[in-house]
Amino acid sequence: MTTYVRERPENVASIFVALGDPTRREIFERVAARPQSVSELAGDLPVSRPAVSQHLRVLKDAGLVSDRAAGNRRIYSMDRCGLQDLRAYLDFFWNQALAAFKTAVEQPPKEQR
């Protein structure tokens, strides 16, 4: 897993940047719940449709959302590939923490050494 983290850091960095903005997180959570158009998303958010489009572009560039044509509009949905990149990155650190915990638990107490 170390190799993965070293080979693809730009993917993870762009995901953290994309999710670092509260409006983008809200948009991402909404499209993760169900596919939506820009108009649907903008209807409930305190930002304009052009701003929603810009946020979606950042999320799409990070690999977190994808879009498809539906008539004269685009429908956005969660892209699982971006989440897989983030999960692999976080799993790397989780596995390190678990290994360190296992080592600590398996060591005899100091008075028994």
Explain the meaning of each model-derived region.
Residues 1-15, 30-44, 49, 58-62, ...:
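C-terminal regulatory/oligomerization modules of transcriptional regulators
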Residues 69-75:
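Short, Lys/Arg-rich nucleic-acid/phosphate-binding segment
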Residues 21, 67-69:
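Conserved strand-loop elements at the edges of beta-sheets that form or border functional pockets
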Residues 13, 19-25:
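Short alpha-helical elements of helix-turn-helix
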Residues 16-17, 75:
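Short basic coil micro-motifs at the edges of alpha-helical modules that engage polyanionic partners
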